[in-house]
Amino acid sequence: MPTKSIKIMVEGGNVKPGPPLAPTLSQLGLNVGEVVKKLNEATSSFKGMSVPVTIEVDSNTKKYEIKVGIPTTTALLLKEAGVSEPSGDPAHKKIGNLSLEQVIKIAIMKKPGLTTKSLKAAVKSMLGTAKSIGVTVENKDPKELVKEVEEGKYDDLLAKYENEWNEVKE
């Protein structure tokens, strides 16, 4: 069964039946409207975010499967902070603030794409991204929180999410 993979970035819940997607789907003999509808349904929980999607198409039967990836860490942090774009000057202009708990939940969501093995390391990675886009955490510079996480100040909070972290497949 010869399969073709189409890898694209789409706006969650807002895929349009235009180029470059439509011509590619048409060439493979797929109903563009139907695929777009299913893409919008599959990505609706990531509304407004860029989401990586893979469409696996069986060239013989025209059956297809949609695999939705996880949005970028930046996109998840921005959505959680309620802003649409990163700060152009993250050192001086802060665009939002998150709780450490929100950052932990994003780390858990991103686990399948991370190379880190521990929740603590994943959270520190998320904090690095938060710093680079101008988002504070617990009303502090994320760099300060990285130090506090390393010192064990948030071990109790991290322990609360350890089971959830361990349940996520890599």
Swiss-Prot record:
InterPro entries: Ribosomal_uL11, Ribosomal_uL11_C, Ribosomal_uL11_C_sf, Ribosomal_uL11_CS, Ribosomal_uL11_N, Ribosomal_uL11_N_sf
Source species taxonomy: Archaea, Thermoproteota, Thermoprotei, Sulfolobales, Sulfolobaceae
Name used for this protein in its record: Large ribosomal subunit protein uL11
Function recorded in the entry: Forms part of the ribosomal stalk which helps the ribosome interact with GTP-bound translation factors.
Entry-linked PROSITE patterns: RIBOSOMAL_L11
Subunit structure comment from the entry: Part of the ribosomal stalk of the 50S ribosomal subunit. Interacts with L10 and the large rRNA to form the base of the stalk. L10 forms an elongated spine to which L12 dimers bind in a sequential fashion forming a multimeric L10(L12)X complex.
Origin species: Saccharolobus islandicus (strain M.14.25 / Kamchatka #1)
Family membership: Belongs to the universal ribosomal protein uL11 family.
Single GO term (MF): structural constituent of ribosome
The keyword RNA-binding belongs to this UniProt entry's keyword annotation: yes
